[in-house]
Amino acid sequence: MKLLASSLKLPNGAILQNRIAKSAMSESMGTLQNAPTKNLIKAYEVWSKGGAGLLITGNVMIDSRALGEPRNVVVENRSNFKLLQDWAKSCEGTGTHIWPQLNLSLIHI
């Protein structure tokens, strides 16, 4: 238990507050226009308050022509910028890192 609770310095210099992480999963909680939803942002806020050191998001696509599945969040321009900022800030003050799982599904293009 002590090891799980101990901090971890990664080779890139990031320091995780502990060794507990939520791995990537495909939440499919974006809008039909592929923006983050308030429910998605709230989920990460709640998970961060659970004390994990790292939350890895589900699929964040970089091209709307190449979705992994419907309702993936897409980052290809600034149209969803405010909601993306809110999502990134959902872990503020908890010490939890949130890292996006960036994807490009070339098979769909």
Pin down the residues of each PLM region.
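Conserved small/polar residues in nucleotide/adenosyl-binding loops
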Residues: 108-109
